[in-house]
């Protein structure tokens, strides 16, 4: 699930476990929402889910032997989720610039984070967006947590109510300790973010549930997915992009 396009691919493994592409398809995302603020870059999360589900259903109808459904997509951005696992906000994309706005005497939020927490977090990172939204009362009252758009798609497919985010996507939010695979709760607390907001994190590819009798797995970041697509999962592999 990208920012400008949504893509799907049907893969089949042969006897050597090499993946063979049976079909690939890309459509326009076209879900940006009009806004009065030129720094705001938000998308219609439910429209994205609708388009993604239509593509998936088309594949499943024509390839009934499919066994598993893997997910990936645009990193950094967040949608807010209520206790029923339903999206209650637009998708705040990685292009959103609210974290770079100058506020009173403190400069921008990203500068304040660097000074207060010694953490490098760019505008568009989920935690930066969340901190800004907290301070400006922009979060819906029913929201209890947040996740990426592909995490939300997985929840909608499986009926899951609790957010589960792969470490690759959790790290893209910012304020994440990649060595410990946990959020920096002490630093987040300094910025007003309490632990109950934070989504549960997994380090492996886990089963979220099922859709049309196929296993749906946790979404990984598009950066990681592109590496696997180009280099595979062989150990000690280096990929150089020019």
Identify the meaning behind each predicted range.
Residues 1-89, 115, 142, 199, ...:
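N-terminal glycine/serine-rich phosphate-binding loop of ATP-dependent small-molecule kinases
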Residues 1-3, 114-223:
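Gly/Ser/Thr-rich active-site cleft segment
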Residues 7-9, 77, 172, 184, ...:
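Conserved beta-strand and immediately adjacent loop positions that scaffold enzyme active sites
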Residues 10-12, 79-82, 133-135, 155-158, ...:
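Short beta-strand-to-turn element immediately C-terminal to the catalytic PLP-Schiff-base lysine
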Residues 96:
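Carbohydrate-associated surface elements
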Residues 101-105, 226-228:
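Pocket-flanking alpha-helical
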Residues 214-215, 219-242:
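Catalytic phosphate/nucleotide-handling subdomain of diverse soluble enzymes
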């Amino acid at each position: 699930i990208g920012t400008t396009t949504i893509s799907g691919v049907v893969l089949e493994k042969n006897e050597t476990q090499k993946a063979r592409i049976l079909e690939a398809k890309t459509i326009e995302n076209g879900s940006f929402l009009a806004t009065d603020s030129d720094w705001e870059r938000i998308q219609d999360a439910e429209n994205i889910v609708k388009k993604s589900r239509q593509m998936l259903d088309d594949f499943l109808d024509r390839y009934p032997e499919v066994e598993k459904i893997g997910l990936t997509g645009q990193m950094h951005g967040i949608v807010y989720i209520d206790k029923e696992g339903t999206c209650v906000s637009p998708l705040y994309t990685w292009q959103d610039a609210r974290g770079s706005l100058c506020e009173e005497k403190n400069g921008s939020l990203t500068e304040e984070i660097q000074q207060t927490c010694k953490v490098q977090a760019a505008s568009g990172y989920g935690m930066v967006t969340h901190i800004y939204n907290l301070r400006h009362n922009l979060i819906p009252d029913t929201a209890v947590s947040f996740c990426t758009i592909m995490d939300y798609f997985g929840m909608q497919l499986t009926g899951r109510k609790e957010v589960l985010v792969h470490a690759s996507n959790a790290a893209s939010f910012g304020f994440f300790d990649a060595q410990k695979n946990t959020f920096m709760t002490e630093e987040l607390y300094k910025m007003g973010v309490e632990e109950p907001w934070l989504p549960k994190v997994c380090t492996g590819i886990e089963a979220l549930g099922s859709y049309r009798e196929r296993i749906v797995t946790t979404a990984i970041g598009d950066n990681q997915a592109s590496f696997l697509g180009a280099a595979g999962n062989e150990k000690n592999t280096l990929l150089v992009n020019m």
